[in-house]
Amino acid sequence: MAKTSMVNRDIKRKKLAEKYAVKRAALKKIVSSQDATYEEKIEAATKLSKLPRDSSPSRHRSRCELSGRPRGVYSKFGLGRNKLREATMRGDVPGLRKASW
């Protein structure tokens, strides 16, 4: 089980990313625009750098919903590999079963 503080920190990062998503996308569009002047691009880049660091979506780490494990997470199910295996063996995941050939 992951530390509660790490899980909470990740939840906070996800909320911040959602909060600033529109503003961040608008500034990124200006920075990558061909039509914007050099001064506009520099201004947009400085505004982008002044946003909270944790508001970047790349700082969010996908975690297992049950255990909070940060690695080996299947995004389709939201579970780590160990918990996904346990759920599959119990028959909780429809259409998923152990491979046999």
Swiss-Prot record:
Cited Gene3D superfamilies: 1.10.287.1480
Origin organism lineage: Bacteria, Pseudomonadati, Pseudomonadota, Gammaproteobacteria, Lysobacterales
Source organism (scientific name): Stenotrophomonas maltophilia (strain R551-3)
Alphabetic keyword roster: Ribonucleoprotein, Ribosomal protein, RNA-binding, rRNA-binding
Listed Pfam families: Ribosomal_S14
Source taxon at top rank: Bacteria
GO molecular function: rRNA binding; structural constituent of ribosome
Region (Disordered): 48-69
Descriptive protein name: Small ribosomal subunit protein uS14
